[in-house]
Amino acid sequence: MAAAVAGGGEEGEELLLLSAVEAGSFGGGGDGGGAGAAAEKSWRLNFDGFRPPEVQQERRPPRGLHHHCLGVLSQGPEDVVAEYYQQQVEMLEGFNEMDTLTDRGFLPGMSKEEREKVARSETLAIRLSNIANMVLFAAKVYASVRSGSLAIIASTLDSLLDLLSGFILWFTAFSMQTPNPYRYPIGKKRMQPLGILVFASVMATLGLQIILESVRSLLSDGDEFSLTKEQEKWVVDIMLAVTLVKLALVLYCRTFTNEIVKAYAQDHFFDVITNMIGLVAALLATYIEGWIDPVGAIILAIYTIRTWSMTVLENVHSLVGQSASPEYLQKLTYLCWNHHKAVRHIDTVRAYTFGSHYFVEVDIVLPSSMPLQEAHDIGEALQEKLERLPEIERAFVHLDYEFTHRPEHALSHEK
């Protein structure tokens, strides 16, 4: 029996998988009353006896700036070995999670009451963010009028887009809460990345307009920018108050795992940065040189364009059907193989993004003599098991009796 997976893996992981197959195929013996139970589970992959040495686990390097910036070239032989064992530990933890799903039929998680409580908290975070954005936008409009600073105006326009983003994200959240199985058969979860994508595109476009206005100001021969003492007092007080409120919202929204609330947290964090840059640029332009103000506005605009361009790319990847990581495909393959002893072969395992969650396609081979009713029940149970995973929105299980055929679907991507 063999398994073919749509993805790759480490050579050591393949050897570990092969060892587990051998252990599962030949390790079904036992003594006494436990012999029957052991024989019943002997067809399953079993990694209980595979554990990396404790000394290797203790020596694993942290995955931080050192790992990502300097890369493999900066690692010695001991670091590479420790990293390898760390990958093995993570793989085994994933397999244990799949074993829990197989044995219990569900993954330990929050109860219905706990989920409702979290949903209410997320709604409160969104409402607080929208109310704060409206109040702070009005305050920054006043600061812009009092100062005339291009940098502060750029920061105020960013707050205007906060209101727009709040409306877009609220609309997507509301749309997902009102399902229509006839008009939207697979749900509306694509509304979430699509709303973020639209907002990010608007942010990047406005940043370009700010750059053009700042360049025009630098090239003009007008009077240099300067704040009076009264203007300076108002601007500093307003901008510092706005920054402190935004910082508190960052810390609050980052306690949630919901993608929309996390988008608000990111938005509030950007506001903290832009508010400080705008204030510093206005003060430096007053006390040093007037050209610092439009330069600060250009810096804010470039920062806005870069940040939201990265957000656009991230959400585009989630919408175009990017494959899951090889490690995740390994977990799914492990789950499929241990699902039922009648599974003779795993032809295909695919997982790809279709919004914020995965769609999964699995092809398994069952005996050709198996009755249709039994084969259907095995496939349906596997589908339900896959859809219990929190990362998966929908799973499709295809049943077959052989695996030497051509692909069933038209491979339009190969034309």
Curated annotation (Swiss-Prot):
Residues 146-150, 214-232, 292-293 are vacuolar. It is found in: Vacuole membrane. Belongs to the cation diffusion facilitator (CDF) transporter (TC 2.A.4) family. SLC30A subfamily. Involved in sequestration of excess metal in the cytoplasm into vacuoles to maintain metal homeostasis. It is a multi-pass membrane protein. GO terms for cellular component: membrane; vacuolar membrane. GO terms for molecular function: manganese:proton antiporter activity. This is Metal tolerance protein 5. Residues 1-124, 172-192, 254-268, 314-415 are cytoplasmic. Keywords: Ion transport, Membrane, Transmembrane, Transmembrane helix, Transport, Vacuole. The chain crosses the membrane at residues 125-145, 151-171, 193-213, 233-253, 269-291, 294-313.
